[in-house]
């Protein structure tokens, strides 16, 4: 089992509410790099979020092997911090590339939407609701495909959820009404994502969370003139405020069969054999080190064979000694 001490810390690549995400290098195999999320477990306990962390780790184990989800390889506890050792995905956030481009054309948006749908199909097939679909939670691999990250708000489908959680712009009407949100809420998030990819901003954007919530519950989607009729039809179906009639109610295949995806070979999508619209430039660290043959990422590369850690209950046992 991998330990935190088995890694050399290279640089910080992200900062969150409870810790940092580091780019790390395996000491025994210096050409292999990973992402390590280091969380302050004491703060997690104070915020009463230990159950949420335990749940996230459990879910990442359940969906291990999904080609569109960043893998969790191992967990460790050291010095009052929990380390989640994960697949490093070096192409940056979809959010970054979207803001850099302003908006995507339909071909580009269709590619990413198809891979997101394939990810949701896998996740839902394992009885899990993602519940936080947004461009910041989608990373691009070195070969141009997507990887979903951050399953902190995800839940098992069998659980009853009556709480508001997530990012305001992407919340579904039923979630705002504190109703039990199921797969339909993920399909709502997909609709928001597709709109944002095509238009540059979410459909219900405003300066305050309350104003956003009001628009989600009361306003209709307004499309720029350049959005095609078939794209409007797809987005309108996904952003149906009535989840009982929302596109996808009859199953995710209803979305996959929409004319917007005409010509898409879903088997090719799921096997990642469709050519991505672009290949991202590696970040500065990977670029400088990889050019000398010193470093390569774990995304899309069989560098080290690891198994996900199976005994996550140790977090609770260790916490008693804090």
UniProtKB/Swiss-Prot annotation:
CDD domains: STKc_AGC
Source taxon at top rank: Eukaryota
EC number: 2.7.11.11
InterPro entries, per database record: AGC-kinase_C (IPR000961), Kinase-like_dom_sf (IPR011009), Prot_kinase_dom (IPR000719), Protein_kinase_ATP_BS (IPR017441), Ser/Thr_kinase_AS (IPR008271), STKc_AGC (IPR045270)
Pfam family, one: Pkinase
GO annotations of cellular component type: cAMP-dependent protein kinase complex
Keyword set, alphabetical order: ATP-binding, Kinase, Nucleotide-binding, Serine/threonine-protein kinase, Transferase
Binding sites annotated in the UniProt record for ATP: 13-21, 37
GO MF terms, alphabetically ordered: ATP binding; cAMP-dependent protein kinase activity; protein serine kinase activity
SMART domains: S_TKc
Catalytic activities: L-seryl-[protein] + ATP = O-phospho-L-seryl-[protein] + ADP + H(+); L-threonyl-[protein] + ATP = O-phospho-L-threonyl-[protein] + ADP + H(+)
Claim: Lipid metabolism is one of the keywords in the record: no
Residue ranges of every copy of the Protein kinase domain listed in the record: 7-261
Limits of the AGC-kinase C-terminal domain: 262-322
Disulfide bridges in this chain: none
Catalytic residues identified in the record: 132 (proton acceptor)
PANTHER family in the record: CAMP-DEPENDENT PROTEIN KINASE CATALYTIC SUBUNIT PRKX, CYCLIC NUCLEOTIDE-DEPENDENT PROTEIN KINASE
Family of this protein: Belongs to the protein kinase superfamily. AGC Ser/Thr protein kinase family. cAMP subfamily.
Descriptive protein name: Probable cAMP-dependent protein kinase catalytic subunit
Native organism: Encephalitozoon cuniculi (strain GB-M1) (Microsporidian parasite)
